[in-house]
Amino acid sequence: MSEKSILLLNRTAPYGSHAARESLDIALTCGAFEFPVSLLFMDDGVFQLLGDHQPQSIGSKNLSASLAALAMYDVDQLFVCQASLAERGLSEADLALPATCVAAADIQSLIAKHTSVLSF
């Protein structure tokens, strides 16, 4: 772990708070400055990776554009907790973005590979 890196731990639903938007803003900023960043989606955070969000009905901006921009900024280290998907009746096929499924038992080692962790 000689190189500094950040893991953004996304645990909240995509709408209802600013947490998801703030996490994506940090990821895009890190990408713009070529700072190593990874995102882990777990708990209700897995809903951020689903397509066809329609937040206009609740007066929120759609996160889909920001999620799609991750690839343009070379932010491609996306992980999703397999257990969180299963608990919500979802599978990897439901995700709008490619993400590596991680077993709950392997999350601690994923966290340990990063020098900083920010939880949202």
Descriptions of predicted regions:
Residues 5, 36-38, 77:
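Residues at the starts of beta-strands that form the adenosine-phosphate
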Residues 7-21, 53-54:
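Short, glycine-rich nucleotide/cofactor-binding loops
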Residues 20-39:
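Histidine-anchored nucleotide/phosphate-binding helix
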Residues 45-59:
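N-terminal beta-loop-helix "entrance" segment that forms/cooperates
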Residues 56-82:
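A glycine-rich helix N-cap at a beta->alpha junction
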Residues 78, 117-118:
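Short, well-ordered beta-strand core segments
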Residues 98-105:
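Short acidic-hydrophobic, aromatic-tinged amphipathic segments that line or gate anion-handling sites
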Residues 114:
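An anion/phosphate-binding loop that grips the pyrophosphate of nucleotide cofactors and donors
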